[in-house]
């Protein structure tokens, strides 16, 4: 199914031979009649799939359990994705065995990027920025280091659309244009860069209505899952407070994010859509003034190393932790900070998903005329 397609960004394809039949420009090779993809080829593929699907359900489940247990981290975890791509029965077995990030703290399938993050500890990620072409790349950290090779998760590219700025978010780092088949969602800002709206390409819960505005039409015509209607669904808003007096100080931001309530434990969030959604209010944690350093400070627990106006931590105000089980108003739901010129850490936890956290962090880039 399309939801489990393996692009170059998620599962490395098998290397192909680069040598031609002739072996050189001066050699003449015989013509080879093209192989027609007739009924025989289709029957052969169906027979191959049927052979794999004949395994006993108990045996298939045990195979998936062992593969899942033996591949806790990427890149070995690509074996789990490969097994899910064999056929429908193998996919169903993978869905029944692989737990969502909320429970296992791991990202396995592309669908995991729109599921709530871990419950007990934050998911460590980092963002790399390319200023030349206005692109941003989200990676999953594979080690304790602040940056490493990482596992690619999402990419975004900034476009000017009249007086507005839009960030197109995609599963594919090489396909970041309007109309992309890998379109995940987008972020849209106002002229001043102080108010942002987050749009999801898929309905966040059952009965969600797509935006009707002309500017928020879905760019991609190809849906990730043909069983679910596609469109641009508003799932959050981020706003930065105006600084009329131009006083020096940290930015102040507020977020209202639509988070599903009663998330299904299935690895495929589109298999059973959530029937309800509730807005989660987040605000940035106020930093303290350090007299000796003469700067504003936050405790990032070693995950941020460079002072920047972009650095922030988001917490839930008192009384808004239910029904997501947030411990208290000191629990950091999302933190973002600079570690190099074009590298930033991004750590998130439930109820935010990787997609939502990435979109919120993207709002920190760019000039904010009324906030600086």
UniProtKB/Swiss-Prot annotation:
Biased composition (Acidic residues): 40-49
Membrane-crossing residue ranges in chain numbering: none
Region (Disordered) location: 1-51
UniProt lineage: Eukaryota, Viridiplantae, Streptophyta, Embryophyta, Tracheophyta
Gene field: TULP9
Tissue expression pattern: Ubiquitous.
Gene3D superfamilies membership: 1.20.1280.50, Tubby Protein, Chain A
Protein name (record): Tubby-like F-box protein 9
Biased composition (Low complexity): 7-18
Pfam families: Tub
Cited InterPro entries: F-box-like_dom_sf, Tubby-like_C, Tubby_C, Tubby_C_CS
